[in-house]
Each structure stands twice: as C-alpha cells, then as structure tokens.
C-alpha cells in the first residue's frame, strides 16, 4: 500500500482522511512495523488541525500508550 495515498499534508498540519467510507474521520499512525488507521472523533480531528497533536490514549492496545504523540510532518 502506498503510504502517500493515506497521508494528507496541508499547510504543515495534519489533514483528516475519508478512507473507503469506513468512517467520517480517520488518521494514520505510522510505526516502525506497520501503518494503523486510527478512527477519530470530530473533536480529535479539530485538535489535530489546530495543534498538530494526535491523542492516542483512548484507542486501545494497538495504539501507543502515550497520551499524545506529535504528528511528524
């Protein structure tokens, strides 16, 4: 899968995704092993758009245990 198809870049901020109609908002988490699609609530997307930070704590064991992780682009 081409990572560039999953990532959005807009004026240096994370761009929310519409992926195959599975969810209204989604974000991509990149790890050294794989790519996880993380579905977000609208509030989380707004947080990402304004701060460039993605909240990971509420998305289960497949996601980083850190409360926040900075989006690296």
Curated annotation (Swiss-Prot):
Name recorded for this polypeptide: Uncharacterized 7.9 kDa protein
């Amino acid at each position: 899968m081409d990572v560039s198809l999953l990532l959005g870049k807009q004026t240096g901020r994370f761009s929310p995704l519409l992926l195959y109609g599975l969810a209204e908002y989604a974000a991509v988490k990149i790890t050294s092993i794989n790519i996880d699609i993380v579905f977000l609530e609208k509030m989380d997307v707004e947080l990402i758009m304004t701060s460039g930070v993605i909240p990971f704590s509420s998305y289960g064991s497949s996601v980083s245990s850190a409360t926040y992780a900075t989006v690296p682009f």
